[in-house]
Structure formats: structure tokens, C-alpha cells
């Protein structure tokens, strides 16, 4: 039994008392539901710390075992290498993306948690990209629901991201530099333009606020565009992607992939995407060879000019 498992068993009711609950003051009357919720929050926070400690110990043990067996300890780049790669590039890939998080009051608590998790995945995708871009999280309301959810992620302040509190993308960038990506737009984004910042709406709404991002963008006088999904693939479902899928797609295209390949590698399999079949026919070399052979046979069956002249001459002599 490791130290963490022992610690998990040693969690006492005193550790989960209201005195250890965040946001509570002794002597303040609380309802039964509030007390129950606070106890659950305290228990979750305490157990999460212990689980993380156990996970770290397991990773250390795996590294030790790998070293003893002479196996490679790490399969991917180290944190130091990733940081060095990002700083060396400095956003030279030309990709600049702003995640619009000014939807704090429109999402339920569970959707806010999902939104922040997507931001974490976006940050990870950008760090691991061969050409990391400039990433901006805009419109965060200080001490709002999204801000509080960010605080639950240890080390979030150290992410290599530009945070903007109480400031939206229109307060930071020139309007002419912004392109808001929405599936309702009439314009198609066929090429990433240098000097542009592409805005992705950080809204997890399950289609409750359909068209809201597009409406806000047009009201602000911003250029909008949609991803060229229908131009490159056929899908069984609507061409609506999550925030981090849109960012991942942009990252791959910025790194040099073509749209079709990037789309097929990014979107979930449940959407049943298949590359669009074009009308342009590929040359069939087998048919070409067969046609050439038939042409040669036809030419050989034709009487040559010399043969025709000889036959005419023989008829003249007979007469």
C-alpha cells in the first residue's frame, strides 16, 4: 500500500468539516442543501489532491522501471523542449487565434466546465504544434464563472496564453484584422491570411443559442467566415464543430496540411465525414493502353498506299 492510499483511508470527518470549506464563515446559518453541497466540494477537493499525488508516484515508479529495463522513458518531447520550440517560433507560423469567452452568463455550470476543458485542450494542441501560434483568451469576466473554473486548474496562470480580463477581442485588435468563424457565414475561409486574427466563440450551448456568435460578430461590424467543410468533405450531420476542433483544424492547415486531410484527421468519426468526390476523372492507363492497341490494329488492317497502287497497275496491264 503506497502513501497516497494510506492518506485516502486517513481522511477524517474533521478534514471535511465546514471550517475547511471555501467560502464559509463560522456562525453563518446555512440550509441543509448548502451544507451538503459544501461538504461534497470539500471532499472532492481533498480527494483530488490525494489522487494527483498517487498519479505522480505511479509515473515516477514507471520511469524507474523503464530505466532499469533500458527502455525509453519518454515517447514525446519534454516540457522543456516544447517550451523552447514555442519560444523559438514566437508565433512565426502566422496563425493568430482569439477564443471569445464573453458568454459567461449564458452557460450552465457543467457547460462552463466543458468550455474551460476545451481551452485546456486548445492550449495543449498549440504547445505541441510544430509551429505554435499566438493564442488569446478574451472576454474573461474577472471573478466570473469562467474565471473561477480556470482557477481550479493548477498552474493555469503560467500557460503561454494571452489572457484578457473584462476586455473583448474588439478592444484588443483592429476590426479589419478580425475574422469571426461561424458556420452561418456566407463567406468561405479557403486560405489563412497573415496578419489576421481568427476568432472562435467559446460557447458550449448544445444549440440553445444557435447563430448567436454570428449575430454578435455582424452587429460589431466584423468580417465573418465559415470553414470550408462542405467544399471538401461530405458529412452525415451538421457542419458544426467544437471550439477545440476548430482550433486544431486551423493549426494543421497553418502547419501546411491541405484542407481535406486536416478535416478528415480532426473531426470526430461519428460525423461520418468522407472526402468529397470531384467530377474530374483520373486517367486510366489500362484503358489508354487498350485504346492504343486497338488503334494500331486498325492501322495495320488498312491497305497501304503502295499496295493500292500495285493493285491498280496490275489491273491496267491485264486490260
UniProtKB/Swiss-Prot annotation:
Keyword Nucleotidyltransferase in record: no
GO CC terms in record: chromatin; nucleolus; nucleoplasm; nucleus
Impact reported for residue 201 to R: Abrogates methyltransferase activity but does not affect the protein's influence on Hsp70 chaperone protein expression levels or on organismal stress resilience
Disruption phenotype: RNAi-mediated knockdown is viable and adult brains show reduced levels of m1G9 tRNA modification and enrichment of m6A modification on mRNA transcripts, in particular those encoding Hsp70 chaperone proteins.
Catalytic activity line of the entry: guanosine(9) in tRNA + S-adenosyl-L-methionine = N(1)-methylguanosine(9) in tRNA + S-adenosyl-L-homocysteine + H(+)
Residue ranges with Basic and acidic residues bias: 40-58, 78-87, 276-302
Occurrences of domain SAM-dependent MTase TRM10-type (ranges): 83-274
Coiled coil: 44-67
GO molecular function, one term: tRNA binding
Keywords: Chromosome, Coiled coil, Methyltransferase, Nucleus, S-adenosyl-L-methionine, Transferase
Composition bias type Polar residues, residue spans: 17-33
UniProt-listed Enzyme Commission number(s): 2.1.1.221
GO biological process, one term: cellular response to heat
Keyword NAD: no
Disordered: annotated span: 16-87, 275-319
Pfam families: tRNA_m1G_MT
UniProt-annotated location(s): Nucleus; Nucleus, Nucleolus; Chromosome
Motif position, Nuclear localization signal: 35-42
Family: Belongs to the class IV-like SAM-binding methyltransferase superfamily. TRM10 family.
Function: S-adenosyl-L-methionine-dependent guanine N(1)-methyltransferase that catalyzes the formation of N(1)-methylguanine at position 9 (m1G9) in tRNAs. Modulates Mettl3-mediated N6-methyladenosine (m6A) methylation of mRNA 5'-UTRs and 3'-UTRs independent of its methyltransferase activity; influences mRNA stability and protein levels, in particular of Hsp70 chaperone proteins and other stress response proteins. Also regulates stability of transcripts encoding proteins involved in signaling processes and proteins involved in neurogenesis and axon guidance pathways.
The protein's name: tRNA (guanine(9)-N(1))-methyltransferase Trmt10A
Species for this entry: Drosophila melanogaster (Fruit fly)
Amino acid at each position: 500500500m503506497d502513501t497516497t492510499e494510506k492518506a485516502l483511508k486517513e481522511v477524517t470527518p474533521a478534514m471535511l468539516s465546514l471550517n475547511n470549506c471555501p467560502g464559509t464563515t463560522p456562525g453563518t446559518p446555512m440550509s441543509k442543501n448548502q451544507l451538503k453541497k459544501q461538504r461534497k466540494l470539500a471532499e472532492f477537493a481533498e480527494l483530488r489532491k490525494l489522487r494527483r499525488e498517487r498519479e505522480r508516484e505511479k509515473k515516477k515508479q514507471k520511469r524507474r522501471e523503464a530505466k532499469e529495463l533500458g527502455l525509453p522513458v519518454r515517447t514525446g518531447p519534454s516540457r522543456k523542449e516544447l517550451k523552447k520550440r514555442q519560444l523559438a517560433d514566437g508565433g512565426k507560423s502566422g496563425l493568430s487565434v482569439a477564443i471569445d469567452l464573453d458568454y459567461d452568463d449564458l452557460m450552465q455550470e457543467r457547460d462552463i466546465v466543458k468550455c474551460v476543458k476545451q481551452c485546456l485542450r486548445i492550449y495543449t494542441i498549440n504547445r505541441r504544434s510544430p509551429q505554435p501560434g499566438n493564442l488569446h483568451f478574451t472576454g474573461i469576466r474577472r471573478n466570473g464563472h469562467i474565471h473561477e473554473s480556470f482557477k481550479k486548474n493548477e498552474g493555469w496562470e503560467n500557460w503561454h496564453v494571452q489572457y484578457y480580463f473584462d476586455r473583448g477581442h474588439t478592444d484588443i485588435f483592429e476590426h479589419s484584422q478580425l475574422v469571426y468563424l461561424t458556420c452561418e457565414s456566407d463567406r468561405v475561409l479557403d486560405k489563412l491570411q497573415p496578419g489576421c486574427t481568427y476568432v472562435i466563440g467559446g460557447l458550449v450551448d448544445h444549440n440553445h443559442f444557435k447563430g448567436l456568435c454570428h449575430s454578435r460578430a455582424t452587429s460589431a461590424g466584423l468580417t465573418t467566415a465559415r470553414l470550408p467543410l462542405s467544399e471538401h468533405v461530405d458529412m452525415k450531420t451538421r457542419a458544426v464543430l467544437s471550439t477545440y476542433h476548430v482550433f486544431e483544424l486551423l493549426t494543421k492547415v497553418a502547419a501546411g496540411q491541405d484542407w481535406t486531410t486536416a478535416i478528415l484527421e480532426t473531426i470526430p468519426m461519428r460525423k461520418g465525414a468522407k472526402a468529397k468526390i470531384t467530377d474530374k476523372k483520373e486517367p486510366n492507363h489500362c484503358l489508354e493502353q487498350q485504346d492504343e492497341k486497338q488503334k494500331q490494329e486498325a492501322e495495320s488492317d488498312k491497305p497501304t498506299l503502295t499496295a493500292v497502287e500495285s493493285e491498280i497497275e496490275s489491273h491496267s496491264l491485264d486490260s
